[in-house]
Amino acid sequence: HAGSDHLSNFPTQSTSQQPTYTQAVPTPIVIRALIITSDASIIIGKQGRHINEIREMSSARLNISESIPTNPERILTVSGALDAVSKAFGLIVRRITDEPFDEPSLPGSRAVTIRLIIPNSRMGSVIGKQGTKIKEIQEASGARLNAGETMLPGSTERILSITGVADAVHIA
């Protein structure tokens, strides 16, 4: 019925006396990353096969900006529920490193750096007081995080680099 996929904590029509509640939809998040054009080509794949596979497996929405001849980088936008976005980034690293999607990262797995674009106003909550939050994320994930000191030219955003194997990037 209409509206069932929207945030709702209201009783729905039911034949029983007890009100029933529909599942609340998680708030979608949007994360953007700078990627080099060669990685963008790998992520997209022939006729979009790779990007469609990542979309299906993660349930996240993925979009890659058009290539600009003077710029070696493109913007990857990943949106959806937090777990879908996290999974998508893990799958993206696996695609770049040419590792199978269904196996855990191995000690010999290649580490990749994902460069997230974070609003300067949000960077404090990522880093935490005296770097506590960023250290927690690093310890929990095994990835290395590095917050850019300066804002990107002509913007109010900074780069947060995450370096690690696919599983570490997924967790971070």
Q: What is the predicted role of each segment?
A:
Residues 1-42, 50-121, 139-144, 148-172:
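Low-complexity, intrinsically disordered regulatory regions of RNA-binding proteins
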Residues 126, 130-136, 141, 148:
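Long, charge-patterned amphipathic alpha-helical coiled-coil/hairpin "stalk" segments used as oligomerization
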